[in-house]
C-alpha cells in the first residue's frame, strides 16, 4: 500500500516538474525565426523536412503516401526526415526519401547539433505530433525553415502554418498538410515497407511450424500504455483459445520480451 502511494506521489511530482520545465522552455524558445516571421505565401516548396523522431511503425504506414505523393507532384523536390536510429530503418527503405538526419532520443544536444547541421536547407518543416518538447523547439529554431507546419499548434508562435481540426485521423492530418503545400489530387493509399530478408524469415517460420490459419497478436506496442502484464497476457491467450479453438496463435515479439512470452 505504501509503495503504491509513494509511486503515485512520485508520478505527481514528476508531472509537475515536467510542466514547469516545458513552460519555461516554451517562453524561451517559442519565437518566430527571422524567416518564418514573414507573411504566409506557401506554394509548392522545393524542399520538405519531416520530423519523425517519435514515429512508430503504425504512424509510418498510414502516412507513407505523403512521400510518394510529394514526389509525384514534383520529382525534383528534396525530401528529408529527422528520426532516431531506432526507427530509421523504416525511412531508409523508402525510395521517395532523399536524406535521413539522425538524432539521439531524448538528447537535447543532439537535436541542437542536427538542427545546426541542416540549418536553412529546407523550406518547409512538417511536425505532425501533438506534444511538443523543449528539444523539439530547439531543433526547429536551429533548422530555421521558412515554414513550420504543425498539428494543433495554434498556441505556438514558431509554427506559422497550423492544422486545427482535432477530429482528424493521422492520415487525414497528412492530407491536410500536403494541401497546405499546394498538392492536389492526393492518393492516400498506404506504402507497406518490405524487407526481403524478413519476408524470407517469416515464410520459413510459417512453413516450418505449419501455420496457415492463425491469429497474430502483439502484446507489446511502442507506448507503455499498450503493454500488457504477464497476467493479462495469459487471460487473453486463454480467451483466444476458448473462442477460436481451431486457430493457432502466433505471438509477435522482440528480444527484450521474448523470455517473458
Please give the residue ranges for each predicted region.
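Catalytic machinery of carbohydrate-active enzymes
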Residues: 1-261
Amino acid at each position: 500500500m505504501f509503495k503504491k502511494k509513494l509511486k503515485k506521489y512520485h508520478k505527481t511530482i514528476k508531472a509537475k516538474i515536467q510542466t514547469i520545465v516545458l513552460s519555461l522552455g516554451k517562453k524561451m524558445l517559442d519565437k518566430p525565426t527571422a524567416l518564418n516571421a514573414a507573411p504566409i505565401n506557401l506554394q509548392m516548396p522545393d524542399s520538405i523536412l519531416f520530423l519523425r523522431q517519435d514515429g512508430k511503425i503504425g504512424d509510418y504506414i498510414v502516412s507513407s503516401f505523403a512521400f510518394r505523393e510529394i514526389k509525384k507532384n514534383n520529382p525534383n523536390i528534396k525530401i528529408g526526415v529527422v528520426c532516431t536510429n531506432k526507427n530509421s530503418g523504416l525511412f531508409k527503405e523508402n525510395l521517395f526519401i532523399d536524406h535521413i538526419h539522425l538524432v539521439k532520443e531524448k538528447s537535447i544536444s543532439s537535436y541542437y547539433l542536427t538542427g545546426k547541421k541542416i540549418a536553412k536547407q529546407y523550406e518547409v518543416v512538417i511536425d505532425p505530433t501533438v506534444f511538443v518538447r523543449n528539444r523539439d523547439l530547439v531543433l526547429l529554431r536551429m533548422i530555421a525553415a521558412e515554414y513550420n507546419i504543425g498539428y494543433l499548434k495554434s498556441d505556438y508562435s514558431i509554427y506559422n502554418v497550423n492544422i486545427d481540426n482535432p477530429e482528424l485521423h493521422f492520415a487525414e492530418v497528412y492530407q491536410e498538410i500536403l494541401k497546405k503545400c499546394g498538392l492536389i489530387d492526393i492518393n492516400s493509399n498506404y506504402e507497406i515497407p518490405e524487407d526481403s530478408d524478413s519476408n524470407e524469415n517469416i515464410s520459413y517460420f510459417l512453413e516450418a511450424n505449419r501455420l496457415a490459419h492463425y491469429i497474430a497478436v502483439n502484446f507489446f506496442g511502442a507506448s507503455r500504455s499498450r503493454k500488457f502484464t504477464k497476467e493479462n497476457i495469459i487471460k487473453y491467450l486463454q480467451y483466444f483459445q476458448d473462442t477460436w479453438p481451431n486457430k493457432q496463435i502466433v505471438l509477435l515479439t522482440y528480444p527484450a520480451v521474448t523470455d517473458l512470452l
